[in-house]
Amino acid sequence: MSHYLQINGQRLIDSLYALGEHGALPGGGVCRLAATAEDKAGRDFVVARMKALGLSVLIDAIGNVTGVYHGEETLPMVMMGSHIDTVATGGLYDGNYGVMAGLEVIATLQDAGIRTRRPLAVTFFTNEEGVRFQPDMMGSVVFAGEYPLAQALAAKDIDGITLDEALRNIGYKGERQPGDMAVDSYVELHIEQGPILDKEQIDIGVVTGVQGISWQEFTLRGVSNHAGTTPMSMRRDAGLAAAKIAVFARELALSLGGNQVATVGHFSVKPNLINVIPNHVVMSVDLRNTDNAILCLAEQQLAEFVAKTSQEEGVEITSRSLVRFNPVIFADEIVNAVEAEAERQALSYRRLPSGAGHDAQFIASVCPAGMIFVPCVDGISHNVKEHSAAKDLIAGANVLLQVVLQRAQRMD
């Protein structure tokens, strides 16, 4: 019976729209920053759904919430999940899809009278987006033991409120130690957040791993002076030096090729006046690659160019690392299972790495982990126009259902 089991597609879509009402923006989309009143409303909605399904709800000290559907045997659980916090101009699907699809999987099994050998669980992790508190993916990195709980709870937002205070304010500061549960495996269903599947008209992305990420912030200090009277040869122009670094970052990515990407996403210039040479710039460079050796090479070449530019332009440049995550390769057993199930269901598929960071990359250090992608229209995400077709959302959830069912019922 389970071989042909399918999720209730309309129930899944309805649940996504219902969750999207919490923090809904007037023009569409969602703003549900971590540990805000809007996040509390979203959390309450999901927890109510968990309880309606009879799940045991566990909340840990970083605010991660897990709903457990107990199995026939006391064994490590097969976990699904993602996050429900959003960016300030978020869509309905990023993160939310993986959480609600996980609950739909359990609802479908209950409808069919199936209780799996291993327990099933759905977790939503705190502060995946990292908008209000840094770093991003905070709940999962603490769960995996790769970031100190105390340090995470001490993180402050722009108003000086700590995450600890914010979680207490919304009633989601649990007592359990993060990661204090036996997890057999983890499968995260997610929209791609990129254009490949949509452009190639492919149903399922079989995610092989997550790119390594290097975020660096550069502060450049030059000398402000009159834009008309200062000869070009006598300038210490922080704006020019920053522009050269930005151009080099693009050229670096193109020269290294492969999966290397580079982005200058933040650029702040002072005094920011049309007739004054800039004396102060703060800028970011985001480097990513699936190959850690090449990512390290990119970091090295960028550092060398920055030092050279500082000397040539007479501009003091300091740097600090904001984020550094190594690439993650997902477990073959999960990757192969996703691929086989897509083929069995006659869905088109391709293997690809994730260009964005996800909770799965940290849970992969705890247990075998993997991800399933579905297309999003034009690759648009972190945007109120984010959209995935219902047929794609349903197809992805049906693949998740079967992969998780196989994991939970296996006899090894």
Show which residues each predicted segment covers.
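Acidic/His- and Gly-rich active-site-bordering loop/insert found
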Residues: Q6-G91
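Zn-dependent metallopeptidase/amidohydrolase metal-coordination segment
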Residues: L12-L25, V78-S82, Y349-V399, R407
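Alpha-helical metal-binding/catalytic segments enriched in His/Glu/Asp
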Residues: L19, M80, G90-E129, S214-L220, ...
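A short beta-alpha structural unit
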Residues: A34, G265-N272, S284-T290, E316-V335, ...
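Flexible, glycine/charged-enriched surface loops at secondary-structure junctions
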Residues: D60, R115-T116, G174-G179, T229, ...
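Acidic, glycine-rich active-site loops and adjacent beta-strand->loop/helix elements
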Residues: G63-V65, I84-T86, L120-V131, Q193, ...
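Midchain, well-structured core segments that form catalytic/ion-binding scaffolds
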Residues: N127-E128, R132-N292
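His/Asp/Glu-rich mid-to-C-terminal helical/loop segments that flank catalytic regions of hydrolases
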Residues: T230-L256, E299, E304, V374-D412
